[in-house]
From Swiss-Prot:
GO terms for molecular function: dihydrolipoyl dehydrogenase (NADH) activity; flavin adenine dinucleotide binding; NAD(P)+ transhydrogenase (Si-specific) activity. This is Soluble pyridine nucleotide transhydrogenase. Its cofactor is FAD. The gene is sthA. It comes from Enterobacter sp. (strain 638). It is found in: Cytoplasm.
Amino acid sequence: MSHSYDYDAIVIGSGPGGEGAAMGLVKQGARVAVIERYHNVGGGCTHWGTIPSKALRHAVSRIIEFNQNPLYSDHSRLLRSSFADILNHADTVINQQTRMRQGFYERNHCEILQGDAHFVDEHTLALKCHDGSVETITAEKFVIACGSRPYHPDDVDFSHPRVYDSDSILSLHHEPRHVLIYGAGVIGCEYASIFRGMEVKVDLINTRDRLLAFLDQEMSDSLSYHFWNSGVVIRHNEEYERIEACDDGVIMHLKSGKKLKADCLLYANGRTGNTDSLALENIGLTTDSRGQLKVNSMYQTALPHIYAVGDVIGYPSLASAAYDQGRIAAQALVKGEATAHLIEDIPTGIYTIPEISSVGKTEQQLTSMKVPYEVGRAQFKHLARAQIVGMSVGTLKILFHRETKEILGIHCFGERAAEIIHIGQAIMEQKGGGNTIEYFVNTTFNYPTMAEAYRVAALNGLNRLF
């Protein structure tokens, strides 16, 4: 690469996508700087998104597990924790993650520049530092990995102390008894689980006709039933007319004529790419209405020397995929092409209580494609390990081709679903006939384990063939 620039490459953002790109670049010998606008590395994933919300979920799920365990049923009072106490656990995890990720950059001699950056021209950035000074830095190539933030419609007053988004909810300073959650996507459903697990009343407003429509319908229905059974009130096909924030709560007026009141509102309906501060107009790049950039298969934007990865390019908007996108972009940036690519079937993990995870095709997709598939199921309540740990709610479903026995999709609802799914994913990725449901019948599993669900489901499915 040319040495007429300050750096071979500058990465804007230190979340999963930026980290993946930066590590991939320095490992190939590039001179790299990473720009981070906040005081600590890690991006939204570490500080406001994946890590804190999953730490919250874990703490709440352990409280639920204790309170429902028959071993402790003789205790006269239930175990409870305040939201502030649980947030302390999340803060501990965030600090550990931040220190670890800071170490990655230090060990690999990757320079971190703190401040807000915007493009001056196609090879120059202006960096406004925290002390107010402005520096000009240049690079031959760039990776935009600045992530996303919660979408804020203009008619919702997010400055009001009773109105939160998925970032600011982590600064909740009071103990709500009733929460309105607008938006029943992944974030909305995860926080509905968290609040309901803390015995908070939850109204979940869904703008669509069912929860998480991208899931296999049985998984979506299982979540809906579990929410209903735990007391979450779900209102489908609703949109707000206006939101009225008061001193003691929030009133939501729906277009259907309904009115809802709660102690606070969590608005969780969509996200926006953090591109508005980059002055992309100075280099001729444009974004869509949600601030997202279009890229090709090597993550190049319309300007070939500028790449973009992670939430800022939209789907799949997963931390796991963003890291891989960063590594692929780094390879393309240095070598001019990328031999690596994202796998076709990216697993999804939804950290509700219980978890949901899936990989591959759904029943609805296979039916519309007219694929002759069969279904194998295992109920967690029949597994010795689930009975031992008292987590009998859940199911594993394997979809496979009736004729070739090839696994086409795996769907799991229950505790540890996001871990369990990877066993099946590993077999699905096998080539040369290695992807077969018969693997689970012919292998030996540790006993007792949750992994045994694969053998149970495989036998159940194969027994349906004739």
